[in-house]
Amino acid sequence: MRFYLAAFFLALSGYAQAADLPPLATGEQIKKAVAGNTVEGSMQASGRYTEFYAKDGTVSGKDYKAVWRIEGDSMCWIYKGQPKDCWRASIKGTTVQWVKDNKVQGTGNIVKGNVNNF
């Protein structure tokens, strides 16, 4: 009986976590928000970032380049030597929250244009 109760509460916590997520953007909404703009923010796993997302699908950071693209309702990145990494996003105004595994794991501020001349 304890096992079933533990499983029930574990499952319930997953539903609560998913219910706490902000509304997720469509692929088209993500593309419209980031293409041609810079996003500055922080990710739980890797810390601060500043990236420019060119309309041609190129990502530029301070000392690197990568590729970005929309697949369905996810934004995917391909950094040199790394596997493709796809995330969902919640966008409200100029604020983006990056969502993976039903958790917000990063945030950013969308700034118009290539403000750092990457």
Where are these regions (language model features)?
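Lipid interaction determinants
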Residues: G14-F118
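Sec-dependent N-terminal signal peptides
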Residues: Y4-L12
